[in-house]
Swiss-Prot record:
This is Chaperone protein DnaJ. Zn(2+) 2 binds at residues 165, 168, 187, 190. Homodimer. The J domain is necessary and sufficient to stimulate DnaK ATPase activity. Zinc center 1 plays an important role in the autonomous, DnaK-independent chaperone activity of DnaJ. Zinc center 2 is essential for interaction with DnaK and for DnaJ activity.
């Protein structure tokens, strides 16, 4: 190995804390790992140096000796040489857990039944906006692994009669070589149990579970939105040989409504009103999401594009007993068509008698245009 300074190799200062050393090591070991750099001899050599440096600096006693006596103490001529090919004493389990698809060692895998837990499942449900408003129970059906009824999930005929697994010799895990590392993985014969059932259940073959259809009612709470999910505990895949069941996650999609547009807990809608109501004010009846009709007051002088707020007429908030959003009514003033002669005469008379105060935006707009042209002409 090269005589490079261990602190320089790990890119830390000599007074770096143990956590800083570990953090830098994790970052560098991912970058230079041989499996991520196949055929790259420089990366392989760098990885060896990183591992050697961390082997020393992560150990308080070795680090103290290194700081006191220098690098030669840990080379082949020193008191504690580092043999890379013999394997690491460093625990890589937390570092490479995701890198190799799982943890290392029996302590994490074979000693726990967590890996035997059934998988979580996903189911997609579409509901109407009205159903999302009031809440609904939705019947669903799906096929998955369920607990075997013949053996009650234990996987054996009668009392369990187990023998040591011949594949892992009872360890629950097997070791395989991956480049420079020895990787410990769950035994695929006994699934980490270390033993196999001698008198396997004929129906499930010893797994404790069989394929079957599951039917249930899922409660969709009021106020639910697209993208929300409902968790149903224990309704996922059955665990292996009596291990914990997974959960079912029901993902919700709320259909688009023909009249209302939803924004969080608020509802928006567009409503046309007559010109006379817009000018004089009045009341119109509005449909609500709960199916009822509500009177909406239109202020005099209402313009197209104005927005009128109806408090508490929106969607209920999830997990709230009484709180609701608001409904926003976007007004469009409709110009009358197919007028009678009398109506035309009345409008002409109105136009003759109208002043600038009646249409301030209109008058202001054309006055602004006149001013612009006057400035251009005078210039």
């Amino acid at each position: 190995m090269s005589g490079n300074d261990y602190y320089e190799i790990l890119e830390v200062s000599r007074n770096a804390s143990a956590e800083e050393i570990k953090k830098s090591y994790r970052k560098m070991v991912f970058k230079y790992h041989p499996d991520k750099n196949p055929g790259d001899k420089k990366a392989e050599e760098k990885f060896k140096k990183i591992s050697e440096a961390y082997e020393v600096l992560s150990n308080p006693e070795k680090r103290a000796a290194y700081d006191r006596y220098g690098h030669s103490t840990f080379t082949s001529g020193g008191a504690s040489g580092f043999d890379f090919t013999s394997g690491f004493s460093t625990d890589f389990s937390d570092i490479f857990q995701d890198f190799f698809g799982g943890g290392f060692g029996k302590s994490q895998r074979a000693s726990s039944r967590e890996h035997l837990r059934g998988s979580d499942l996903r189911y997609d449900v579409e509901v109407s906006l009205e159903d999302a408003f009031k809440g609904i129970k939705v019947p669903i059906s799906y096929v998955t692994n369920v607990k075997c009824s013949s053996c009650s999930g234990i996987g054996s005929e009668g009392a369990v009669n187990s023998v040591k697994c011949g594949n892992c010799n009872g360890a629950g895990s097997v070791r395989t070589r991956k480049g420079f590392l020895t990787i410990e993985e769950v035994c695929n014969v006994c699934n980490g149990e270390g033993e196999v059932i001698k008198n396997k259940c004929r129906r499930c073959g010893g797994s404790g579970r069989v394929r079957n259809e599951v039917s249930l009612l899922v409660t969709v709470p009021k106020g639910i939105e697209t993208g929300n999910k409902v968790r149903v505990n224990g309704k996922g895949e059955a665990g292996f040989r009596g291990a914990q069941e997974g959960d079912l996650y029901v993902y919700i999609r709320v259909k688009e409504h023909k009249f209302f547009t939803r924004r969080s807990s608020d509802l928006h809608c567009s409503v046309p009103i007559k010109m006379t109501i817009a000018a004089l004010g009045g009341e119109i009846e509005m449909p609500s999401i709960d199916g009822s009709w509500t009177k909406l007051k239109i202020p005099e002088g209402t313009q197209s594009g104005d927005q009128i707020r109806m408090r508490g007429k929106g969607m209920p908030e999830v997990n709230s007993k009484d709180r609701r959003g608001d409904m926003y009514v976007h007004v469009t003033v409709e110009t009358p068509v197919k007028l009678t002669k009398q109506q035309v005469d009345l409008l002409k008379k109105f136009e003759e008698e109208s002043s600038a105060n009646c249409s301030p935006k209109y008058q202001g707009f054309f006055q602004k245009i006149k001013d612009i042209w006057r400035d251009i002409s005078s210039g």
